[in-house]
Amino acid sequence: MDPFLIQSPFSGFSPEYSIGSSPDSFSSSSSNNYSLPFNENDSEEMFLYGLIEQSTQQTYIDSDSQDLPIKSVSSRKSEKSYRGVRRRPWGKFAAEIRDSTRNGIRVWLGTFESAEEAALAYDQAAFSMRGSSAILNFSAERVQESLSEIKYTYEDGCSPVVALKRKHSMRRRMTNKKTKDSDFDHRSVKLDNVVVFEDLGEQYLEELLGSSENSGTW
């Protein structure tokens, strides 16, 4: 049987074909030029032809992929989670803990600017209740130092968690008062036709949230 003439992928190469030419122009020129003889009934020749064709197609794919732009994938940095800390919708962080001295009731310790501050407040409460057996976010040494810095003390018969809550509440009030006094000194306030509402503070709002959560939990 006479061998069939099968178009070879490389039969179209000529001096006119340049490196910058596209695969389309290469295939179009190859259809009008020389052909290599392959016997369609010869398995070895057809296998060789298949390898040549596959190699050519892979070359086209690799060449095209080099021209594709590389997309940078930005990974969102996940926030570190701390024990006893919740993020509030307005961006601040609340610390809370279950008071083992009062039948495990959940106590809101306060709202803080950062998750680390809230986590430290939780650690202070946990350490004051359970001592070295407490599971903490930070090291016990750091927690002990922070308790010394805020001059933490509590009376016998009083919950150490409640004492810490009062301590944080007093510190927030003092900080807010200093901030308001500073703002008032640096600006003049015009009160013509202005209705002034009483600022109940974050603590009141947090207590409302805490009471609603407790009513749904217990």
Swiss-Prot record:
GO CC entries: nucleus
Tissue expression as described in the entry: Ubiquitously expressed, mostly in flowers and rosettes after ethylene treatment.
Transit peptide among keywords: no
Cellular localization per UniProt: Nucleus
Primary location: nucleus
Any GO MF annotation of the entry: transcription cis-regulatory region binding
Function comment: Acts as a transcriptional activator. Binds to the GCC-box pathogenesis-related promoter element. Involved in the regulation of gene expression during the plant development, and/or mediated by stress factors and by components of stress signal transduction pathways. Seems to be a key integrator of ethylene and jasmonate signals in the regulation of ethylene/jasmonate-dependent defenses.
Protein name (database record): Ethylene-responsive transcription factor 1B
